[in-house]
C-alpha cells in the first residue's frame, strides 16, 4: 500500500490518506439549492474542492435540486444517491456555507457512518456579548463569544465527551455539512419500510423512485421536542443504536446578513460549563 502525497496538517492533528483509500471513495455531493441559487463563497469553496479532488484522483459526482421544501429535497437527493451503486458516501453541503476542501478529506478519513462539521447558527447571542464586554474581551473577539452551533454534544456520566481520532460523538447535528455512508441508508430502509413514499414530483426516474423514503422528516419526538428534518434524521438513526460524530476542528462560515464563522472546538473550550446534557 503506497502512501499518497495527501497529508493534512491542522493545529489539532496531522493525518495521512492512502492511495487505496482515495481509490475506494466516490462521494456524491448533494446540494439543495433553494430557488436555484447559491452563494459566491460556497461556489469558490466548491471550485477549490473540485480542483483538489481532481489533482489527487478522487472520484466525485454532484447533484443539485431546487425545492421549496428542504426535507423533500434531501430525501430526493438520497434516492438519487442510492440508485447509483458507484457512490460510497453522500455529502450534504448547504449552499450558504463556505469551507476548506481539506475538511471533506478529513471527514472521509474518520471512516464513520455519519460524520459532520458543526457550523454557527445565523444569530447573535447578545447576552453572551454583554458578558464578554463585562469580562474585558477584546472588541474583535466579541462575535466569537456570541456564536452558537447547530449541534448538541453527547455527554456521559463522567461529564466527558466521547472522542475518537479527534472526532466527538454528538446527540444532534445539522445536515448542512454531513457525510453519510451508503450503509446508513440501507439499514434505515430496512428498519423503516413505513417511510417509503410515492414520488409525485417527476424529479426521480424509475430506478430512483425505489429509494424514496422520508428519512429527513420533521416530527415531535418522545420528549415533546419538535425536531427539524435534520435532527429528525439523527433521531431515527440513534433509535437504531447508530452514532453521529463531528470533527470540532472544522471551521465553517454560515452566510446570512453577515458572516458567522467558528470552530466547535473553540466553543467547547470556552463554554464547557454551559453545554446542556441531553436526556
PLM regions: where:
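N-proximal low-complexity "stem/linker" segments adjacent to membrane-targeting elements
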Residues: 2, 6-67
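C-terminal catalytic/acceptor-binding lobe
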Residues: 8-9, 22-24, 191-279
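Anion (oxyanion) recognition and catalysis
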Residues: 54, 108, 237-238
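Residue-level detector of anion-binding/catalytic polar loops
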Residues: 59, 96, 113, 243-244, ...
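A short, glycine-/small-residue-rich helix N-cap motif at loop->alpha-helix starts
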Residues: 68-73
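Active-site nucleotide-sugar/metal-binding loop of Leloir-type enzymes
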Residues: 76-89
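Short beta-strand-to-loop acidic/aromatic patch adjacent to the donor-nucleotide binding site
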Residues: 87-98
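Conserved catalytic core of nucleotide-sugar-dependent glycosyltransferases
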Residues: 100-204, 211-217
Amino acid at each position: 500500500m503506497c502512501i499518497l502525497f495527501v497529508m493534512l496538517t491542522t493545529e489539532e492533528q496531522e493525518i495521512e490518506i492512502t492511495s487505496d483509500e482515495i481509490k475506494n471513495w466516490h462521494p456524491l455531493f448533494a446540494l439543495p439549492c433553494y430557488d436555484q441559487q447559491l452563494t459566491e463563497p460556497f461556489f469558490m469553496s466548491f471550485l477549490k474542492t473540485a480542483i483538489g479532488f481532481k489533482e489527487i484522483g478522487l472520484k466525485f459526482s454532484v447533484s443539485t435540486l431546487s425545492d421549496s421544501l428542504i426535507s423533500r429535497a434531501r430525501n430526493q437527493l438520497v434516492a438519487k444517491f442510492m440508485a447509483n451503486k458507484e457512490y460510497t458516501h453522500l455529502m450534504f453541503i448547504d449552499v450558504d456555507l463556505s469551507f476548506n476542501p481539506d475538511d471533506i478529506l478529513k471527514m472521509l478519513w474518520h471512516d464513520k457512518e455519519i460524520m459532520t462539521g458543526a457550523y454557527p447558527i445565523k444569530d447573535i447571542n447578545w447576552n453572551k456579548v454583554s458578558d464578554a464586554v463585562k469580562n474585558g474581551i477584546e472588541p474583535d473577539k466579541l462575535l466569537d463569544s456570541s456564536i452558537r452551533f447547530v449541534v448538541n454534544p453527547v455527554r456521559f456520566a463522567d461529564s466527558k465527551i466521547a472522542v475518537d481520532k479527534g472526532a466527538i460523538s454528538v446527540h444532534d447535528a445539522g445536515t448542512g455539512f454531513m457525510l453519510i455512508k451508503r450503509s446508513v441508508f440501507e439499514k434505515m430502509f430496512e428498519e423503516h419500510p413505513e417511510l417509503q413514499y410515492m414520488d409525485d414530483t417527476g424529479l426521480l426516474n424509475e430506478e430512483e423512485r425505489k429509494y424514496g423514503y422520508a428519512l429527513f422528516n420533521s416530527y415531535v419526538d418522545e420528549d415533546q421536542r419538535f425536531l427539524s428534518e435534520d435532527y429528525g434524521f439523527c433521531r431515527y438513526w440513534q433509535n437504531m443504536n447508530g452514532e453521529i460524530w463531528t470533527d470540532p476542528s472544522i471551521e465553517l462560515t454560515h452566510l446570512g446578513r453577515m458572516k458567522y464563522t467558528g470552530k466547535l472546538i473553540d466553543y467547547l473550550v470556552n463554554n464547557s460549563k454551559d453545554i446542556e446534557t441531553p436526556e
